[in-house]
């Protein structure tokens, strides 16, 4: 396998080395000691000049493909990610796609399968100036806004798909399109959300989204989406578009062991 680097190893590719040094967003993932640039505990993929560079944990000595498969298995097990096609092996998935592409397709396929069962809706409280009374009459707002009697300011509940969970998914499917070549599944998901308002999402606040018996079927898709949003790093350096998809191996190993213990 070409373009493979291992954790805590020096980077010999001069172009890649200069790219990392000149890209501020990447500095926390590498260590520069004098002129020697080394990887640290972060593993994953770094795309630069249309080339994929894999940073892998050294588990099986001198076997790049085996190390990559073990790394991805750890990711999938720790985060409970299912293969896009369970009849297709992980190696076959990776022959034509990089690791980020594979994870995005898994996310999009899982989300689309749930959306085909029905879009999640919930009751949202709204206030509006309407020609007829709907819900609760708001005295103060009517005195403030309505000088004539042809409108009624009221508050009511509406069963709507335009809720925070669907807004999160819409943001995610649009955002991830910039990282992948095959956008088909993401665009199919996007079409389902045509009545949902697009909003910029703060990924540090989305954990406040609550799950119940009506939307719990979307929880795995939500967790994978959150993983992709947090670990995908868009990079722009000298008008060249690239990205990184990196994981802290210390955190990954803890999650992997925690799930293993939970299943005992």
Language-model-detected regions and their locations in the chain:
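A short, highly charged nucleic-acid-interacting micro-segment common to nuclease
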Residues: 210-214, 239-258
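Terminal, charged accessory segments of proteins
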Residues: 1-204, 217-238
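A short acidic/basic microdomain associated with nuclease active sites
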Residues: 263-264
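A generic structural micro-environment signature
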Residues: 61, 117, 253-255, 259
């Amino acid at each position: 396998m070409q373009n493979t680097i291992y954790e805590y190893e020096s980077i010999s590719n001069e172009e890649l080395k200069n790219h990392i040094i000149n890209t501020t967003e990447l500095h926390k993932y590498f260590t520069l000691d004098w002129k020697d640039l080394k990887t640290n505990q972060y593993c994953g993929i770094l795309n630069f000049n249309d080339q994929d560079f894999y940073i892998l944990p050294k588990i099986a000595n001198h076997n790049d493909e085996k190390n990559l498969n073990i790394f991805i298995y750890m990711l999938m097990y720790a985060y409970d990610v299912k293969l896009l096609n369970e009849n297709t092996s992980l190696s076959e998935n990776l022959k034509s796609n990089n690791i980020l592409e594979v994870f995005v397709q898994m996310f999009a396929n899982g989300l689309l399968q749930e959306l085909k069962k029905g879009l999640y809706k919930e009751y949202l409280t709204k206030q509006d100036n309407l020609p007829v009374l709907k819900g609760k009459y708001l005295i103060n707002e009517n005195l403030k806004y309505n000088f004539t009697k042809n409108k009624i300011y009221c508050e009511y509940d509406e069963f709507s798909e335009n809720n925070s969970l669907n807004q999160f998914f819409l943001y995610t499917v649009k955002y991830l399109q910039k990282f992948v070549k095959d956008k088909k599944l993401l665009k199919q998901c996007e079409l389902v959300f045509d009545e949902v308002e697009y909003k910029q999402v703060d990924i540090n606040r989305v954990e406040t989204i609550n799950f119940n018996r009506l939307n719990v079927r979307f929880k795995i898709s939500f967790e994978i989406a959150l993983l992709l949003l947090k670990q995908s790093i868009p990079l722009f350096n000298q008008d060249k578009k690239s990205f990184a998809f990196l994981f802290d191996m210390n955190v990954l190993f803890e999650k992997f062991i925690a799930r293993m213990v939970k299943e005992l």
